[in-house]
Amino acid sequence: MRLVVCLVFLASFALVCQGQGYKGPYTRPILRPYVRPVVSYNACTLSCRGITTTQARSCCTRLGRCCHVAKGYSG
């Protein structure tokens, strides 16, 4: 009797390891790693128009190109 139980357990374990066993829905939430948005160099235009505040700050920090209201880039 113990041999039968052991064989059934091993067979079911082998099926699960091969992906042939229970194929239910994934029950845990999928966690996405936090990735900082990367601003491309193309976003740092010379006119400061059409870019977001975040992109403007990034351009100022990384490249020294800082937007000022109605003045365009300085630096």
Swiss-Prot record:
Disulfide bonds join 44-59, 48-66, 60-67. This is Penaeidin-3k. It is found in: Cytoplasmic granule. Residues 1-19 form the signal peptide. GO terms for cellular component: cytoplasm. Pfam families: Penaeidin. It comes from Penaeus setiferus (Atlantic white shrimp). The modification Pyrrolidone carboxylic acid is found at residue 20.
